[in-house]
A protein has these predicted regions:
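Interfacial transmembrane-helix termini
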Residues: 19-38, 63-85, 95-104, 112-135, ...
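Alpha-helical transmembrane segments of multi-pass inner-membrane proteins
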Residues: 112-115, 145-176, 187-254
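Helix-loop-helix junctions and helix-breaking kinks within/between transmembrane helices
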Residues: 24-33, 70-79, 120-130, 186-194, ...
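Hydrophobic transmembrane alpha-helices and their immediate junctions
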Residues: 214, 261-262, 348-386
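Long extracytoplasmic/lumenal interhelical loops at the membrane interface
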Residues: 290-349
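Transmembrane alpha-helical segments and their membrane-water interfaces
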Residues: 42-48, 84-165, 206, 252-253, ...
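Transmembrane alpha-helices of multi-pass inner-membrane enzymes
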Residues: 16-22, 378-388, 396-418
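A membrane-periplasm/extracellular boundary helix in multi-pass inner-membrane enzymes
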Residues: 168-171, 234-235, 252-291, 307-312
């Protein structure tokens, strides 16, 4: 069987698996455990046996939909299961992986450091440790020349499209009200919004810079941008909307297209915004933007308490941190998240951990220093994760989709660099 025919069959197969995943829409009960195990095996075995380079995009797509989708999913919630899958798969197929990627040395150091601090200081491995280890091993499944690059972009586009459809079809009937403004969601709308924003930015880059391999891909990208932008407005997450907006501005301003086309794109976006505003899509977002709460829904109070707890620690703790588990319970009875990745890294992993985090963020910039064609997309995606980390803690919280998004940024920078 030719490689082209094999991949076509695998695409059809995984499209069917997506339909099965999305067909379970109960928000209160998961499928029976035997059925979930069979589904998981059916999901990973074809990729492992026939196309190992597809395993990572498949896991990234299905774990995101399982986490942020409307229902209790076929996909397990325990991250150690995915670490086991990736580790066993790598052991089985390593000899078949020719000219594969390697994780950045600085990322390896960061991963070892974080896991060590959590194990020694927190006395347990937590979600961030499992997510880091999963991504570290995932690099080995990726080719150096990037022939599967479109699969990774398509992964985040599919995530955005399906989550958008969930939002518009089931959003009102199955949502849980989370604010007095009427904003509704079945998961945290801030994390949900940023995950959808990832696909919007990638799709927008495909459309503006004409990177689609065929016209069908381009049409899907256009649909993604349209659906995703409308979702982000109606989802009313200020942070997610800001992250997406900044990234899109960077892509537009620094894209390769002519000035006349950039002006046309800006006018088209402006018309879209006016249309959505006229239809009332901006109502909840506008109300939240005009909110006079100077604490950012209590975020500054949390930051102050956590920072005070950090300053009360000894020098060793300030340098190397206290681990995620102890940081979660620091200063606030019952425990509470930081709502800021930078503060979370500082408290949980010390000054050393925060510096290492900035180093892994800066790594893709180093790769594109001499690659002007890839600078806009890499800078825009880095700006996206840096902004969303200001009011959330997706990375210290161990959100696997966000770590896979970081991995994609590295790959986009590397594929151009090599």
């Amino acid at each position: 069987m030719s490689e082209r025919r094999l991949y076509r069959r695998l695409y059809i197969y995984y499209f069917f698996m997506l339909i099965v995943l999305c067909s379970w829409v109960s928000p209160t009960s998961a499928p029976p455990m035997p059925l979930r195990l069979v589904y998981l095996l059916a999901l990973v075995l074809p990729a492992i046996l026939k196309a190992p380079n597809m395993l990572v995009p498949v896991l990234a797509c299905f774990t995101a939909l399982g986490t942020y989708g409307i229902s209790c999913s076929y996909m397990p919630t325990e991250k150690w299961i995915y670490l086991l899958i990736v580790a066993v798969s790598l052991f089985l197929v390593f000899s078949r992986l020719k000219s594969c990627q390697r994780p950045p040395i600085i990322f390896v150091v960061f991963c070892i450091y974080v896991c060590f601090i959590d194990f020694i200081r927190g006395e347990e491995l937590v979600d961030i440790d499992y997510s880091l280890l999963i991504v570290l091993l995932s690099f080995f499944f990726v080719s150096k020349n990037g022939y599967e690059k479109d699969n990774y972009t398509l992964t985040f586009i599919i995530i955005t499209v399906i989550l958008s459809l969930f939002f518009f079809i089931y959003g009102q009937s199955s949502a849980v009200e989370v604010s007095e403004t009427g904003r509704r969601s079945w998961v945290d709308p801030n994390y949900f919004g940023n995950v959808c924003g990832m696909g919007v930015v990638l799709a927008y880059n495909v459309v503006v810079n004409k990177l689609a391999p065929n016209r069908y891909f381009n049409k899907i990208a256009i649909i993604t941008v349209t659906l995703g932008m409308l979702l982000l407005v109606m989802n009313a997450s200020r942070g997610a909307f800001l992250s997406m907006s900044v990234a899109i501005v960077v892509v537009t301003v620094f894209s390769k297209v002519k000035l006349k086309k950039k002006i046309g794109i800006a006018l088209l976006v402006a018309l879209g915004v006016i249309a959505m505003y006229s239809l009332g899509a901006f109502d909840v977002l506008t109300e939240r933007l005009m909110d006079e709460d100077i604490t950012g829904n209590g975020r500054t109070i949390i930051w102050g308490a956590k920072m005070q707890g950090y300053m009360n620690g000894d020098t060793f703790e300030k340098l190397f941190g206290i681990g995620y588990s102890k940081g979660f319970y620091l200063a606030i009875p019952g425990g509470f998240g930081f709502h800021n990745d930078y503060l979370a890294f500082l408290v949980d992993y010390g000054v050393v951990g925060l510096i290492l985090f900035f180093c892994i963020v800066a790594y893709p910039l180093k790769l594109v220093a001499n690659s002007p064609s890839k600078r806009p997309i890499v800078i825009s995606l880095l700006a996206f994760i840096l902004i969303c980390s200001m009011t959330l803690e997706p990375f210290t919280y161990g959100r696997l989709t966000y770590w896979y998004f970081y991995m994609l940024i590295v790959l986009l920078a590397r594929w151009d660099h090599t």
